């Protein structure tokens, strides 16, 4: 709910003007999961990796819904997958998982400069493109679940419900 609450606060304070851009970070990790709208916080069956994947799916759905809302104000809202960036991601896992992630990053990851290329691209261009998922500097496909307007609407409404006491 971080993106959801933060964006609501800055919109309430009129800190976002016409022709602005909102760029959210998602991930290719969103593939292969969906959401249980009756248990978004995974209280029944929590798994850290699945929670991460679902949070990135939520970022895409949030981006799609927010882009619909702000389109009339000429505010573009997009999200991106930065790639498998060599960071300390996964350092809070047990030794075996941590080692696996480190090896994967060493041999298949990209450096931080490469990971920021799509972000910089979105900052510099595409004022009129909105509601899209970008990877490697271009609009890329995301999962079928993430493309559903119905799912975006459901997540938006559930997010309003969960965060009502903070808004």
Where does each model-flagged region fall?
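Rossmann-fold NAD(P)H-dependent dehydrogenase/reductase core
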Residues: 1-89, 157, 165-167
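Short, glycine/charged-enriched secondary-structure capping and boundary segments
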Residues: 36-40, 92-96, 148-149
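A short C-terminal helix-loop "cap" of Rossmann-like NAD(P)-dependent dehydrogenase/epimerase domains
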Residues: 42-43, 95-105
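C-terminal helical subdomain
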Residues: 55, 102-151
């Amino acid at each position: 709910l971080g993106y959801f609450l933060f964006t609501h606060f800055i919109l309430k304070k009129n800190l976002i003007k016409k022709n602005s851009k909102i760029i959210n970070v998602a991930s290719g990790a969103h593939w292969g999961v969906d959401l249980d709208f009756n248990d978004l916080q995974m209280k029944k069956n929590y798994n850290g990796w699945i929670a991460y994947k679902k949070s990135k799916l939520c970022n895409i759905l949030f981006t799609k819904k927010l882009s619909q809302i702000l389109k009339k104000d000429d505010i573009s809202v997009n999200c991106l997958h930065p790639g498998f960036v060599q960071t300390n991601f996964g350092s809070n896992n047990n030794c075996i998982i941590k080692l696996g992630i480190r090896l994967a990053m060493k041999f298949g990851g990209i450096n931080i400069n490469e990971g920021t290329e799509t972000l910089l691209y979105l900052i510099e261009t595409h004022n009129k493109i909105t509601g899209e998922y970008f990877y490697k500097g271009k609009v890329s496909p995301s999962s079928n679940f993430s493309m559903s307007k119905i799912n975006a609407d459901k997540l938006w409404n559930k997010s309003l419900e969960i965060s009502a006491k903070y808004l």
